[in-house]
Swiss-Prot record:
It comes from the Eukaryota. Residues 239-252, 338-351, 415-428 have a biased composition (Low complexity). It comes from Xenopus laevis. This is Midnolin-A. Residues 390-399 have a biased composition (Basic residues). Residues 365-376 have a biased composition (Basic and acidic residues). Residues 184-219, 232-256, 333-376, 390-429 are annotated as: Disordered. Keywords: Cytoplasm, Nucleus. One of its GO terms (cellular component) is cytosol. PROSITE patterns: UBIQUITIN_2. SMART domains: UBQ. InterPro entries: Midnolin, Ubiquitin-like_dom, Ubiquitin-like_domsf.
Length: 453
Protein backbone atom coordinates (compact mmCIF):
# COMPACT_ATOMS: atom_id res chain seq x y z
CA UNK A 1 0.00 0.00 0.00
CA UNK A 2 1.55 3.21 -1.14
CA UNK A 3 1.66 6.11 1.24
CA UNK A 4 0.45 9.42 -0.04
CA UNK A 5 2.96 12.23 0.20
CA UNK A 6 2.16 14.41 3.20
CA UNK A 7 1.58 18.09 2.65
CA UNK A 8 4.10 20.26 4.49
CA UNK A 9 2.80 22.26 7.44
CA UNK A 10 4.01 25.51 5.93
CA UNK A 11 1.76 24.94 2.94
CA UNK A 12 -1.24 24.30 5.16
CA UNK A 13 -0.52 27.46 7.12
CA UNK A 14 -0.34 29.48 3.92
CA UNK A 15 -3.60 27.93 2.77
CA UNK A 16 -5.25 28.80 6.03
CA UNK A 17 -3.98 32.38 5.96
CA UNK A 18 -5.29 33.01 2.45
CA UNK A 19 -7.73 35.95 2.61
CA UNK A 20 -11.35 35.54 1.66
CA UNK A 21 -12.98 37.56 -1.10
CA UNK A 22 -16.52 38.61 -0.21
CA UNK A 23 -19.05 40.08 -2.63
CA UNK A 24 -20.83 43.00 -0.99
CA UNK A 25 -24.09 44.02 -2.65
CA UNK A 26 -26.15 46.90 -1.31
CA UNK A 27 -29.84 47.50 -1.84
CA UNK A 28 -29.03 50.69 -3.76
CA UNK A 29 -27.26 48.72 -6.50
CA UNK A 30 -23.62 49.12 -5.45
CA UNK A 31 -21.44 46.03 -5.83
CA UNK A 32 -17.82 45.57 -4.88
CA UNK A 33 -15.45 42.94 -3.54
CA UNK A 34 -13.76 43.06 -0.16
CA UNK A 35 -10.77 40.97 0.92
CA UNK A 36 -10.74 40.01 4.61
CA UNK A 37 -8.67 37.60 6.72
CA UNK A 38 -10.14 34.14 7.36
CA UNK A 39 -10.58 34.81 11.08
CA UNK A 40 -12.35 38.15 10.57
CA UNK A 41 -15.33 38.95 12.76
CA UNK A 42 -18.59 40.69 11.91
CA UNK A 43 -17.52 43.76 13.86
CA UNK A 44 -14.26 43.99 11.92
CA UNK A 45 -16.08 43.56 8.61
CA UNK A 46 -18.46 46.39 9.47
CA UNK A 47 -15.50 48.57 10.38
CA UNK A 48 -13.87 47.92 7.00
CA UNK A 49 -17.10 48.72 5.17
CA UNK A 50 -17.63 51.91 7.19
CA UNK A 51 -14.10 53.09 6.37
CA UNK A 52 -14.69 52.47 2.69
CA UNK A 53 -18.16 54.00 2.46
CA UNK A 54 -17.56 56.77 5.05
CA UNK A 55 -20.70 55.66 6.89
CA UNK A 56 -20.95 55.06 10.66
CA UNK A 57 -20.70 51.43 11.62
CA UNK A 58 -23.90 51.55 13.67
CA UNK A 59 -25.92 52.34 10.55
CA UNK A 60 -24.80 49.25 8.64
CA UNK A 61 -26.73 45.98 8.58
CA UNK A 62 -25.33 42.85 6.91
CA UNK A 63 -27.43 39.92 5.69
CA UNK A 64 -26.19 36.49 4.66
CA UNK A 65 -28.87 34.23 3.19
CA UNK A 66 -31.51 36.43 4.80
CA UNK A 67 -29.87 36.06 8.20
CA UNK A 68 -28.78 39.19 10.00
CA UNK A 69 -25.13 39.22 11.06
CA UNK A 70 -24.71 40.73 14.50
CA UNK A 71 -21.61 39.18 16.10
CA UNK A 72 -19.19 36.27 15.86
CA UNK A 73 -16.64 35.06 13.34
CA UNK A 74 -17.47 34.86 9.66
CA UNK A 75 -16.42 31.21 9.34
CA UNK A 76 -18.66 30.20 12.23
CA UNK A 77 -21.60 31.81 10.46
CA UNK A 78 -21.02 29.79 7.28
CA UNK A 79 -19.35 32.57 5.29
CA UNK A 80 -16.52 31.40 3.04
CA UNK A 81 -14.59 32.62 0.03
CA UNK A 82 -16.93 33.98 -2.63
CA UNK A 83 -19.93 34.42 -0.33
CA UNK A 84 -22.41 37.14 -1.13
CA UNK A 85 -23.50 39.57 1.58
CA UNK A 86 -26.31 42.08 1.38
CA UNK A 87 -25.78 45.54 2.84
CA UNK A 88 -28.78 47.36 4.31
CA UNK A 89 -28.03 50.96 5.28
CA UNK A 90 -30.33 52.03 8.11
CA UNK A 91 -32.08 55.36 7.67
CA UNK A 92 -33.30 57.44 10.62
CA UNK A 93 -36.01 60.05 10.35
CA UNK A 94 -37.65 62.50 12.68
CA UNK A 95 -36.14 63.54 15.97
CA UNK A 96 -34.02 60.41 16.40
CA UNK A 97 -31.23 61.72 14.18
CA UNK A 98 -30.86 64.78 16.43
CA UNK A 99 -30.37 62.71 19.58
CA UNK A 100 -26.80 61.71 18.76
CA UNK A 101 -24.57 61.76 21.79
CA UNK A 102 -21.10 63.34 21.84
CA UNK A 103 -19.42 60.00 22.54
CA UNK A 104 -21.11 58.50 19.49
CA UNK A 105 -19.75 61.35 17.37
CA UNK A 106 -16.25 60.75 18.75
CA UNK A 107 -16.47 57.01 18.09
CA UNK A 108 -17.71 57.60 14.56
CA UNK A 109 -14.81 59.95 13.89
CA UNK A 110 -12.28 57.49 15.28
CA UNK A 111 -13.74 54.49 13.48
CA UNK A 112 -13.39 56.29 10.17
CA UNK A 113 -9.60 56.39 10.64
CA UNK A 114 -7.48 53.87 8.83
CA UNK A 115 -4.84 51.74 10.51
CA UNK A 116 -2.12 53.73 8.76
CA UNK A 117 -3.41 57.01 10.20
CA UNK A 118 -3.60 55.55 13.71
CA UNK A 119 -0.09 54.09 13.51
CA UNK A 120 1.41 57.27 12.06
CA UNK A 121 -0.22 59.36 14.78
CA UNK A 122 0.78 57.15 17.71
CA UNK A 123 4.32 56.84 16.37
CA UNK A 124 4.61 60.63 16.00
CA UNK A 125 5.08 60.70 12.23
CA UNK A 126 2.02 62.77 11.36
CA UNK A 127 -0.63 64.82 13.18
CA UNK A 128 -4.23 63.78 13.52
CA UNK A 129 -7.17 66.11 12.87
CA UNK A 130 -10.68 65.14 13.93
CA UNK A 131 -13.88 66.93 12.95
CA UNK A 132 -16.48 66.40 15.68
CA UNK A 133 -20.07 67.52 15.57
CA UNK A 134 -21.98 67.88 18.83
CA UNK A 135 -25.51 69.05 18.11
CA UNK A 136 -25.27 72.20 16.01
CA UNK A 137 -21.62 72.82 16.87
CA UNK A 138 -18.65 71.70 14.80
CA UNK A 139 -15.33 71.28 16.58
CA UNK A 140 -11.92 70.57 15.07
CA UNK A 141 -9.36 68.88 17.31
CA UNK A 142 -5.76 68.45 16.22
CA UNK A 143 -3.42 66.12 18.10
CA UNK A 144 0.31 65.85 17.57
CA UNK A 145 2.55 63.33 19.32
CA UNK A 146 6.33 63.61 19.44
CA UNK A 147 8.47 60.80 20.86
CA UNK A 148 11.86 61.32 22.49
CA UNK A 149 14.82 59.00 22.79
CA UNK A 150 15.55 57.95 26.36
CA UNK A 151 18.94 57.75 28.02
CA UNK A 152 19.89 61.42 27.86
CA UNK A 153 20.68 63.52 30.90
CA UNK A 154 18.47 66.44 29.82
CA UNK A 155 14.83 65.81 29.05
CA UNK A 156 13.68 68.20 26.39
CA UNK A 157 10.05 67.41 27.05
CA UNK A 158 8.36 68.73 30.05
CA UNK A 159 6.57 66.06 32.03
CA UNK A 160 7.43 62.76 33.70
CA UNK A 161 4.55 60.99 35.40
CA UNK A 162 4.72 57.43 36.71
CA UNK A 163 2.00 54.88 37.15
CA UNK A 164 -0.10 54.77 40.25
CA UNK A 165 1.42 51.67 41.86
CA UNK A 166 4.66 51.15 39.94
CA UNK A 167 8.01 52.91 39.85
CA UNK A 168 8.68 52.52 36.13
CA UNK A 169 7.76 55.39 33.86
CA UNK A 170 4.71 55.11 31.65
CA UNK A 171 3.82 56.73 28.31
CA UNK A 172 2.85 60.35 28.56
CA UNK A 173 0.85 62.73 26.50
CA UNK A 174 0.96 66.48 26.84
CA UNK A 175 -0.19 69.50 24.91
CA UNK A 176 2.29 72.06 23.71
CA UNK A 177 1.87 75.76 24.37
CA UNK A 178 0.73 78.11 21.67
CA UNK A 179 3.72 80.41 21.37
CA UNK A 180 2.46 83.93 20.80
CA UNK A 181 4.06 87.08 22.10
CA UNK A 182 0.83 88.61 23.38
CA UNK A 183 -0.27 85.69 25.53
CA UNK A 184 1.25 84.72 28.86
CA UNK A 185 1.61 81.04 29.60
CA UNK A 186 1.61 79.11 32.83
CA UNK A 187 4.35 76.60 33.54
CA UNK A 188 4.33 73.93 36.20
CA UNK A 189 6.74 71.74 38.08
CA UNK A 190 5.81 68.07 38.06
CA UNK A 191 7.23 66.72 41.36
CA UNK A 192 5.95 68.09 44.62
CA UNK A 193 2.53 68.21 46.23
CA UNK A 194 2.17 71.98 45.75
CA UNK A 195 3.86 72.86 42.45
CA UNK A 196 4.72 76.54 42.00
CA UNK A 197 3.88 78.35 38.82
CA UNK A 198 5.85 81.00 36.98
CA UNK A 199 4.62 83.52 34.47
CA UNK A 200 6.44 84.19 31.22
CA UNK A 201 5.36 86.58 28.49
CA UNK A 202 6.68 84.68 25.49
CA UNK A 203 7.57 81.14 26.54
CA UNK A 204 6.91 78.68 29.31
CA UNK A 205 9.48 77.06 31.58
CA UNK A 206 9.03 73.50 32.78
CA UNK A 207 11.02 71.27 35.06
CA UNK A 208 11.59 67.55 34.90
CA UNK A 209 11.59 64.65 37.30
CA UNK A 210 14.59 62.50 38.07
CA UNK A 211 13.47 59.56 35.92
CA UNK A 212 14.07 59.54 32.18
CA UNK A 213 11.68 57.69 29.92
CA UNK A 214 10.27 57.91 26.40
CA UNK A 215 7.78 60.75 26.38
CA UNK A 216 5.09 61.84 24.02
CA UNK A 217 3.58 65.25 23.62
CA UNK A 218 0.31 66.20 22.05
CA UNK A 219 -1.34 69.32 20.76
CA UNK A 220 -4.98 70.13 21.47
CA UNK A 221 -6.48 72.78 19.30
CA UNK A 222 -10.16 73.55 18.79
CA UNK A 223 -10.94 75.30 15.52
CA UNK A 224 -7.38 76.49 15.49
CA UNK A 225 -6.70 77.64 11.97
CA UNK A 226 -3.93 80.18 11.86
CA UNK A 227 -2.58 79.35 15.31
CA UNK A 228 1.08 78.40 15.37
CA UNK A 229 1.84 75.61 17.82
CA UNK A 230 5.43 74.93 18.71
CA UNK A 231 7.24 73.36 21.65
CA UNK A 232 8.99 75.54 24.17
CA UNK A 233 12.69 75.90 23.60
CA UNK A 234 13.63 77.24 27.01
CA UNK A 235 14.64 74.91 29.84
CA UNK A 236 15.38 75.87 33.42
CA UNK A 237 15.78 73.94 36.66
CA UNK A 238 12.86 73.83 39.03
CA UNK A 239 13.20 76.02 42.11
CA UNK A 240 10.71 77.15 44.72
CA UNK A 241 10.77 80.54 46.36
CA UNK A 242 9.90 81.63 49.84
CA UNK A 243 8.76 78.98 52.28
CA UNK A 244 7.54 76.48 49.70
CA UNK A 245 8.74 72.90 50.03
CA UNK A 246 11.63 71.94 47.79
CA UNK A 247 11.69 68.18 48.36
CA UNK A 248 9.08 65.68 47.25
CA UNK A 249 8.49 62.17 48.44
CA UNK A 250 8.40 59.23 45.98
CA UNK A 251 4.71 58.75 46.65
CA UNK A 252 3.95 62.28 45.47
CA UNK A 253 5.41 61.54 42.01
CA UNK A 254 2.84 58.86 41.32
CA UNK A 255 -0.34 60.04 39.66
CA UNK A 256 -3.63 58.40 38.85
CA UNK A 257 -4.51 57.96 35.18
CA UNK A 258 -6.14 61.07 33.81
CA UNK A 259 -5.42 64.58 32.61
CA UNK A 260 -5.04 67.96 34.27
CA UNK A 261 -5.46 71.24 32.39
CA UNK A 262 -2.66 73.59 33.35
CA UNK A 263 -3.45 76.62 31.18
CA UNK A 264 -6.19 77.71 28.85
CA UNK A 265 -6.00 80.57 26.36
CA UNK A 266 -8.85 82.01 24.29
CA UNK A 267 -7.21 83.57 21.23
CA UNK A 268 -10.37 84.50 19.33
CA UNK A 269 -14.06 83.56 19.30
CA UNK A 270 -14.02 79.81 18.73
CA UNK A 271 -10.22 79.44 18.81
CA UNK A 272 -8.73 77.91 21.95
CA UNK A 273 -5.43 76.40 22.94
CA UNK A 274 -4.02 75.17 26.20
CA UNK A 275 -1.74 72.83 28.04
CA UNK A 276 -2.76 69.64 29.77
CA UNK A 277 -0.73 66.75 31.13
CA UNK A 278 -1.57 63.24 32.18
CA UNK A 279 -0.71 59.56 32.06
CA UNK A 280 -2.31 56.77 30.11
CA UNK A 281 -4.44 54.11 31.70
CA UNK A 282 -2.67 50.74 32.10
CA UNK A 283 -5.25 49.17 29.80
CA UNK A 284 -3.99 51.38 26.96
CA UNK A 285 -0.40 50.10 27.37
CA UNK A 286 1.22 46.94 26.16
CA UNK A 287 3.54 44.68 28.15
CA UNK A 288 6.53 46.95 27.39
CA UNK A 289 4.74 50.06 28.68
CA UNK A 290 4.23 51.60 25.23
CA UNK A 291 0.87 52.95 24.00
CA UNK A 292 -1.25 50.42 22.16
CA UNK A 293 -1.65 51.05 18.45
CA UNK A 294 -5.41 51.25 18.64
CA UNK A 295 -8.15 53.86 18.49
CA UNK A 296 -8.81 53.08 22.16
CA UNK A 297 -5.63 54.96 23.06
CA UNK A 298 -6.78 58.06 21.16
CA UNK A 299 -10.23 57.76 22.71
CA UNK A 300 -8.67 57.55 26.18
CA UNK A 301 -6.71 60.78 25.58
CA UNK A 302 -9.83 62.59 24.38
CA UNK A 303 -11.92 61.30 27.28
CA UNK A 304 -9.27 62.40 29.77
CA UNK A 305 -9.22 65.85 28.22
CA UNK A 306 -13.02 66.14 28.24
CA UNK A 307 -13.13 64.94 31.84
CA UNK A 308 -10.50 67.49 32.81
CA UNK A 309 -12.60 70.35 31.42
CA UNK A 310 -15.33 69.59 33.95
CA UNK A 311 -12.92 70.19 36.82
CA UNK A 312 -11.26 73.18 35.20
CA UNK A 313 -13.30 76.33 35.81
CA UNK A 314 -10.39 78.77 35.80
CA UNK A 315 -10.45 82.37 34.67
CA UNK A 316 -8.77 83.42 31.40
CA UNK A 317 -4.99 83.71 31.74
CA UNK A 318 -5.06 87.45 31.09
CA UNK A 319 -7.43 88.10 33.99
CA UNK A 320 -5.56 85.68 36.23
CA UNK A 321 -2.25 87.32 35.42
CA UNK A 322 -3.69 90.77 36.08
CA UNK A 323 -5.15 89.59 39.37
CA UNK A 324 -1.83 88.04 40.37
CA UNK A 325 0.13 91.19 39.55
CA UNK A 326 -2.32 93.34 41.52
CA UNK A 327 -2.16 91.11 44.58
CA UNK A 328 1.61 90.87 44.40
CA UNK A 329 1.95 94.65 44.16
CA UNK A 330 -0.40 95.21 47.13
CA UNK A 331 1.41 92.61 49.23
CA UNK A 332 4.76 94.14 48.36
CA UNK A 333 3.53 97.60 49.36
CA UNK A 334 2.17 96.25 52.65
CA UNK A 335 5.45 94.48 53.38
CA UNK A 336 7.43 97.67 52.70
CA UNK A 337 5.07 99.74 54.85
CA UNK A 338 5.33 97.41 57.86
CA UNK A 339 9.10 96.92 57.78
CA UNK A 340 10.89 99.54 55.66
CA UNK A 341 14.30 98.84 57.21
CA UNK A 342 14.55 95.09 56.52
CA UNK A 343 14.86 94.30 52.82
CA UNK A 344 16.06 90.72 52.77
CA UNK A 345 15.65 88.54 49.65
CA UNK A 346 13.48 86.06 51.52
CA UNK A 347 10.91 88.69 52.44
CA UNK A 348 10.72 90.05 48.92
CA UNK A 349 10.39 86.67 47.24
CA UNK A 350 7.82 85.24 49.63
CA UNK A 351 4.86 87.27 48.33
CA UNK A 352 5.77 86.27 44.78
CA UNK A 353 5.76 82.57 45.61
CA UNK A 354 2.53 82.93 47.56
CA UNK A 355 0.88 84.75 44.69
CA UNK A 356 2.03 82.15 42.18
CA UNK A 357 0.60 79.33 44.24
CA UNK A 358 -2.61 81.26 44.73
CA UNK A 359 -2.90 81.81 40.99
CA UNK A 360 -2.51 78.10 40.40
CA UNK A 361 -5.22 77.11 42.85
CA UNK A 362 -7.62 79.99 42.12
CA UNK A 363 -10.92 78.68 40.80
CA UNK A 364 -14.06 80.79 40.77
CA UNK A 365 -17.34 79.27 41.87
CA UNK A 366 -19.95 77.96 39.50
CA UNK A 367 -22.37 80.78 40.35
CA UNK A 368 -19.85 83.39 39.22
CA UNK A 369 -19.30 81.53 35.97
CA UNK A 370 -23.04 81.26 35.35
CA UNK A 371 -23.50 84.96 36.06
CA UNK A 372 -20.80 85.79 33.53
CA UNK A 373 -22.44 83.59 30.90
CA UNK A 374 -25.88 85.07 31.61
CA UNK A 375 -24.48 88.60 31.33
CA UNK A 376 -22.88 87.78 27.99
CA UNK A 377 -26.12 86.24 26.71
CA UNK A 378 -28.10 89.26 27.87
CA UNK A 379 -25.73 91.61 26.03
CA UNK A 380 -26.13 89.58 22.85
CA UNK A 381 -29.93 89.69 23.11
CA UNK A 382 -29.91 93.45 23.66
CA UNK A 383 -27.60 93.89 20.69
CA UNK A 384 -29.94 91.85 18.48
CA UNK A 385 -32.94 93.85 19.68
CA UNK A 386 -31.15 97.10 18.84
CA UNK A 387 -30.27 95.86 15.36
CA UNK A 388 -33.84 94.75 14.73
CA UNK A 389 -35.18 98.13 15.91
CA UNK A 390 -32.79 99.98 13.58
CA UNK A 391 -33.83 97.73 10.74
CA UNK A 392 -37.50 98.50 11.38
CA UNK A 393 -36.77 102.24 11.40
CA UNK A 394 -34.89 102.02 8.11
CA UNK A 395 -37.72 100.02 6.56
CA UNK A 396 -40.29 102.57 7.73
CA UNK A 397 -38.21 105.47 6.40
CA UNK A 398 -37.86 103.71 3.05
CA UNK A 399 -41.60 103.07 2.91
CA UNK A 400 -42.45 106.67 3.81
CA UNK A 401 -40.12 108.04 1.15
CA UNK A 402 -42.00 106.13 -1.56
CA UNK A 403 -45.45 107.20 -0.28
CA UNK A 404 -47.46 109.76 -2.32
CA UNK A 405 -48.11 111.99 0.72
CA UNK A 406 -45.62 113.07 3.32
CA UNK A 407 -47.15 113.12 6.76
CA UNK A 408 -45.72 115.32 9.44
CA UNK A 409 -43.89 113.31 12.08
CA UNK A 410 -45.06 115.73 14.80
CA UNK A 411 -48.75 115.25 14.19
CA UNK A 412 -50.86 114.06 17.01
CA UNK A 413 -52.65 110.77 16.72
CA UNK A 414 -56.37 110.93 16.34
CA UNK A 415 -58.50 108.58 18.27
CA UNK A 416 -62.13 107.73 17.86
CA UNK A 417 -64.38 106.87 20.71
CA UNK A 418 -67.72 105.53 19.64
CA UNK A 419 -70.43 103.42 21.12
CA UNK A 420 -71.96 100.30 19.66
CA UNK A 421 -74.38 102.28 17.53
CA UNK A 422 -72.44 104.73 15.41
CA UNK A 423 -75.43 105.79 13.36
CA UNK A 424 -77.03 107.48 16.37
CA UNK A 425 -74.49 110.26 16.22
CA UNK A 426 -73.27 109.73 19.75
CA UNK A 427 -69.73 108.91 18.56
CA UNK A 428 -67.30 111.79 18.50
CA UNK A 429 -64.07 112.23 16.60
CA UNK A 430 -61.34 113.82 18.66
CA UNK A 431 -59.20 115.90 16.30
CA UNK A 432 -56.68 118.53 17.20
CA UNK A 433 -57.46 121.43 14.88
CA UNK A 434 -54.30 123.31 15.76
CA UNK A 435 -52.19 121.02 13.55
CA UNK A 436 -53.56 119.87 10.27
CA UNK A 437 -53.32 116.20 9.41
CA UNK A 438 -51.67 116.88 6.06
CA UNK A 439 -49.51 119.76 5.00
CA UNK A 440 -48.40 119.99 1.37
CA UNK A 441 -44.80 120.69 0.54
CA UNK A 442 -45.74 123.45 -1.95
CA UNK A 443 -48.03 126.18 -0.69
CA UNK A 444 -50.95 126.63 -3.06
CA UNK A 445 -51.95 130.17 -4.03
CA UNK A 446 -55.74 130.42 -3.96
CA UNK A 447 -57.57 133.34 -5.47
CA UNK A 448 -60.83 134.61 -4.14
CA UNK A 449 -62.85 133.48 -7.14
CA UNK A 450 -61.92 129.85 -6.57
CA UNK A 451 -63.04 129.81 -2.97
CA UNK A 452 -66.56 128.57 -2.49
CA UNK A 453 -68.30 130.04 0.49
Amino acid sequence: MEQQPSVPRSCTNVARETPMNLNIQSTTGTRYELSVPPDETVDGLKRRISQRLKVPKDRLTLLHRETRLSSGKLQDLGISDGSRLTLLPSVEAGLMSQMSRPEQSVMQALESLTETQVNDFLSGRSPLTLALRVGDHMMFVQLQLAAQQSGSSHLQHRHVITRGAETSASPQYRTLHTSTSAVSHLASCTPGPTPPTTLSPTSSTHCNGPHSSPLTTSVFRSHGEGVAVSPCAEQAPCSTRGTEGTSSSPSSRSRKPGAIIESFVNHAPGVFSGTFSGTLHPQCQDSAGRPRRDIGTILQILNDLLSATRHYQGMPPSLTTLRCHTQCASQARNAKATSPQSTSPQQTTHPVGHCQTQTRTYKPSGDRLRQTENRATRCKVERLQLLMHQKRLRRKARRDSRAPYHWMPTRKSSRTSSNSSTSSGEGSLEIDFEDSLWKPDVKAELNSEFVVA
